[in-house]
């Protein structure tokens, strides 16, 4: 439908024929229309009635008075909010240009009447240009569906087949044909090794491992069964030895070329360290075409293609499956550490289970800690199990009552706290089993205390009774460390705490004591926020007479091994993220450890000599701990996984997820599908849209993927890739203990006046690149000055390269260089980058309101679903009061003690109008408004609102075409529709000033605002 805008829309706002419609109301409310508007104001003034001067009417009593004042306050707040609304306006020159542009584009296209799908709103939130689907005849719906299906099939070659395949992918897709010459060569190499001194020395070590004595038994079981479960304690050698047993057995039988083993690891650090260890045991270097190598995201040292062992992260196999659904070149797949139950390994188990019938020759080995091996065997049709005994020294365990009795601990503050306030129901994790256990705990408490009095001193029982077990008692830990240092033998101490705050506080507590300030102690905090330079000290043995104290999160349970630990202090809590499907919010809280966690922690103490493990919970609590942590799939959003299921062609999302070992709830699955439909990544048949295909191929969650695509389309690629990498990995800032305030100040310095955590990371990254170009010393000084991790920055740099490869392969850019000038025409414009952030992260929007009722200026922040929320203390916006606009876009919202926005960026009205949800034009009494999803509301003259809405429609059409057939925008072709529409939108975003009633152009400043 084409408009002659000057014919249909008068300069004063409404259709010429509408008389008192838009035109009349515009004149009445803004053009000095004193009658209606002022009259209503006067009428409202008398509303106080008999109360006089705004007091309540005299006939009201009790609760009625309170309700009257509440209603009055609500009206006052609503009016204040109306007056604070930003005004969307444009000068006459731009208005004229956009009218001409729209007229030209719409005439040129002579658009067909088929409704366009909005990228930013659910399909049923159209712009009102098409009858709702439910009102259409079935025959019409069927024809439309078939047409769409045919279009999609025609475009499939573009979408499914990436143009670019990297070296690692080529390696993975290599065919595995038997090769007699290679078989002989591998056999000769293995025989030769047996005379190599390095190999012989390593062999002596291997022979001492419990797994080595079971070599024949293990190999026979794997040979004779398609699936085998191997369980074993830490230190038994299952991860390093089982793969070697299989490979050497094949080589010795003259079938080495037919053996290609892939072993998955849950973490990057373990994939690398295990591969390097196995290579060393085989007297080889890791990778370089030898027998053993690794592949993790953005890093690989690949082994030879046949007769080899590849250690890789679980995500690598899932990506591999996209190109080779049957893993046809793999002879053995070993899934290690499956007891951890992370999301990817649970999914891979189900995929592999389905694969067994297609690949009867494929051997599957599942490796787990001892505790739950039976469950995995049952899942794979009661396949055989074999157990390898552990190799640890005995460890003496102490529970809370033992510790208090042993060190005669008395809390400083003797305040009785309710034992039953939360108990097992830590945070907001509403699980029935937790509630049931809490009820049992409460019921058994009196009997437990009676039993304690028979075995422990009265003072110990009194302390146990008074302690608040919701909190980790850091004073008790400090006292226990002091006791170990003074009374026990030498040996490193490892303390497990739930999070950064506890680690930081305990460190300060120890350093406040003169004893720990001496050079006889090395205290090392171990956390992802800590600089990695400090953390390398963890692995170094200390000189005689020096005691190492490591304060860590659960990263020290399995990911790393600290050899010299003799004493473990188990704080009893672990930070867990959960997803509340009812309120659509992530929550993070300190939960009680599981029995499996406790066992792992205990095992850390007995690796080199007999050890001691101190658990900071009582024996009643110990008896009620869960066997394992809740599997990740039951406590995380599922959007990224749903896209993976579709790209791997695993069938219906709900059907596939229902077959997992622990299926997620229907609510969680439906919520994720709904979000993906709103994002236009899935259609109503739950099939991938063209956008969905691109998002599924990007190794990030969907909102970040969408941001990456927009960064390419709007030619601000480099900064947007920096933001995307940091959101999907982590930001590069570190917080050394004792330097928190200085670190915060440096971060704010990098923020400049952007009012954006995301642009702060961009500025930090740019500074690092410049420093790096000048040399290593400058890079080191820069990172030191601004509290940045050079390792993390390097990882972000590598990830940006990977994202650019994906974009090149899909056709969105013409170079794999993130800094290619053609992809960065708008990269210096902060407002355009903010618009792209908004395009990716919408609808994660928060509203800012200035709170003037306080003595000092403050802002309150709200979201649509949560009401009042808080900006996280680490955000650069936490103390900000001078915002240009009233809206923030954020990535992570999480409930801990409060609901926090962890990162946010201030965005302008045009960002939200062009890249937000469904647009509607409304009237709010005397105010003309334009709204996004009916809650983000701006003042706007009707003619401007209609121009914006039409321009937005053109943008949606253009974007849909770009996604279906990607190619870079040709900015030199200024006459092209693409260039004209995008340039007009960019121009509006770039030139938008702070648009509140205080700084409007003269034609807006009239009686309404004075």
Curated annotation (Swiss-Prot):
Residues 267-319, 500-559, 640-699, 851-862, 872-902 are annotated as: Necessary for interaction with single-stranded DNA at the 3'-end of the G4-DNA structure. The modification N6-acetyllysine is found at residue 949. Residues 1-107 are annotated as: Required for the pre-miR-134 transport. The DHX36-specific motif (DSM) form folds into a DNA-binding-induced alpha-helix that together with the oligonucleotide and oligosaccharide-binding-fold-like (OB-fold-like) subdomain bind to Myc-promoter G4-DNA-containing structure in an ATP-dependent manner. Upon G4-DNA-binding, DHX36 pulls on DSM in the 3'-direction, inducing rearrangement of the RecA-like 1 and 2 and the degenerate-winged-helix (WH) regions; these rearrangements are probably responsible for the ATP-independent repetitive G4-DNA unfolding activity, one residue at a time. Residues 1-54 are annotated as: Required for recruitment to cytoplasmic stress granules. This is ATP-dependent DNA/RNA helicase DHX36. Multifunctional ATP-dependent helicase that unwinds G-quadruplex (G4) structures. Plays a role in many biological processes such as genomic integrity, gene expression regulations and as a sensor to initiate antiviral responses. G4 structures correspond to helical structures containing guanine tetrads. Binds with high affinity to and unwinds G4 structures that are formed in nucleic acids (G4-DNA and G4-RNA). Plays a role in genomic integrity. SUPFAM superfamilies: P-loop containing nucleoside triphosphate hydrolases (SSF52540). Gene3D superfamilies: 1.20.120.1080, P-loop containing nucleotide triphosphate hydrolases. The modification Phosphoserine is found at residue 965. GO terms for cellular component: axon; chromosome, telomeric region; cytoplasm; cytoplasmic stress granule; cytosol; dendrite; mitochondrion; nuclear speck. Keywords: Acetylation, Activator, Antiviral defense, ATP-binding, Cell projection, Chromosome, Cytoplasm, Developmental protein, Differentiation, DNA-binding, Helicase, Hydrolase, Immunity, Innate immunity, Magnesium, Metal-binding, Mitochondrion, Nucleotide-binding, Nucleus, Phosphoprotein, Repeat, Repressor, RNA-binding, Telomere, Transcription, Transcription regulation, Translation regulation, Transport. PANTHER family: ATP-DEPENDENT DNA_RNA HELICASE DHX36 (PTHR18934:SF237), ATP-DEPENDENT RNA HELICASE (PTHR18934). Changing residue 63 to A: Decreases G4-DNA-binding. It is found in: Nucleus; Cytoplasm; Cytoplasm, Cytosol; Cytoplasm, Stress granule. Residues 56-108 are annotated as: Required for G4-DNA- and G4-RNA-binding. A motif (Nuclear localization signal) lies at residues 519-530. It comes from Bos taurus (Bovine).
